[in-house]
């Protein structure tokens, strides 16, 4: 497959050949969804915690005698039915991670890339280099490319000036190619790849 290459100024810079095995698949939403769930589960902190009846700070003595009061039988005021008592079956500190095979994760990334290509939301630029780290200049670059919401993927090493210039622009994320992931691809409108990123992806999946 051939796709036009743009410069950061928005002019044409030839074409690039894209691998069908990476950008030409028929996107499977089920595989992509599994990958997104896996990523979000890994991100979740899991620091939620409530105190059980064994952990609340309250006396453990029996509230009143067992018989003769006409009231319901109770032991400690730590029981879950009382205000200030422990929580029954509450959340505990735990990891929310679950397993997803490495081959499925790799396949999900290829399907996400293919989905962007199929939706005409993939842009290839020749290089991501800025003369200086000025946000105003970077805003002009993204306007020239028609980008308001995008994930920008560079090569293994990002140009420092370009990275700093784009850092404060809302809805624009810049990552090196080794940081590319399904969740970030889907949460942004356009996907911008440098030629170096395309080469690195094809090397990774060959």
From Swiss-Prot:
Taxonomy, superkingdom: Bacteria
Compositional bias annotation for Basic residues: 64-77
Pfam families, A to Z: Ribosomal_L4
InterPro entries listed in its UniProt record: Ribosomal_uL4 (IPR002136), Ribosomal_uL4-like (IPR013005), Ribosomal_uL4_dom_sf (IPR023574)
Cellular compartments per GO CC: ribonucleoprotein complex; ribosome
Keywords per UniProt: Ribonucleoprotein, Ribosomal protein, RNA-binding, rRNA-binding
Region ranges (Disordered): 63-96
Biological process per Gene Ontology, one example term: translation
Gene Ontology molecular function, alphabetical: rRNA binding; structural constituent of ribosome
Function: One of the primary rRNA binding proteins, this protein initially binds near the 5'-end of the 23S rRNA. It is important during the early stages of 50S assembly. It makes multiple contacts with different domains of the 23S rRNA in the assembled 50S subunit and ribosome. Forms part of the polypeptide exit tunnel.
The protein's assembly and partners: Part of the 50S ribosomal subunit.
Similarity section: Belongs to the universal ribosomal protein uL4 family.
Name of the protein this chain belongs to: Large ribosomal subunit protein uL4
Top-level taxonomy: Bacteria, Pseudomonadati, Pseudomonadota, Alphaproteobacteria, Hyphomicrobiales
């Amino acid at each position: 497959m051939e796709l036009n290459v743009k410069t950061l100024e928005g002019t044409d810079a030839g074409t690039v050949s894209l691998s069908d095995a990476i950008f030409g698949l028929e996107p499977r939403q089920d595989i992509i969804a599994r990958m997104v769930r896996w990523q979000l589960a890994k991100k979740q902190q899991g620091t939620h915690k409530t105190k059980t009846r064994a952990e609340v700070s309250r006396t453990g003595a029996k509230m009143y005698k067992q018989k003769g009061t006409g009231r319901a039988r109770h032991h400690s005021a730590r029981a879950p039915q009382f205000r200030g008592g422990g929580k029954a079956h509450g959340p505990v500190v735990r990891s929310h991670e679950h397993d997803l095979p490495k081959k499925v994760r790799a396949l999900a990334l290829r399907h996400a890339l293919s989905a962007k290509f199929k939706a005409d939301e993939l842009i290839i630029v020749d290089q991501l280099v800025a003369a200086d780290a000025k946000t105003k200049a970077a805003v002009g670059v993204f306007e020239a490319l028609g980008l308001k919401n995008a994930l920008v993927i560079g090569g293994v090493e990002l140009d420092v000036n370009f990275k700093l210039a784009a850092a404060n622009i809302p809805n624009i994320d810049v990552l090196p190619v080794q940081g590319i992931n399904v969740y970030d691809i889907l949460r942004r409108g356009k996907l911008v790849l440098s030629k170096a990123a395309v080469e690195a992806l094809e090397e990774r999946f060959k």
